[in-house]
Amino acid sequence: MSIFSSLSSLSTGSLKSSVSSIENGSSSGSFGSNETSGWGQHHWNSCHPCPPPRPICRPCPPCRPEPRCHRY
């Protein structure tokens, strides 16, 4: 059981890190709705050439405060 518990804690930890980096707290299904809010898909693509999968995009959020990124 110790192996399973460590595995579960690892998976939840990675999930929390990805969610906190996005600062959204919602699942990947709402990524399309964020596009209308102003800093969804447009923000990620305008700041960095990030692919659609968000876990790979983790280094991207620090670019968010830039005005030119926020405008798109």
From Swiss-Prot:
- Region (Disordered), start-end ranges: 1-42
User: What ranges does the record list as Low complexity composition bias?
Assistant: 1-38
Q: What is the top-level taxon of the source organism?
A: Eukaryota
Q: What is this protein called?
A: Putative uncharacterized protein DDB_G0285569
Q: Which organism is it from?
A: Dictyostelium discoideum
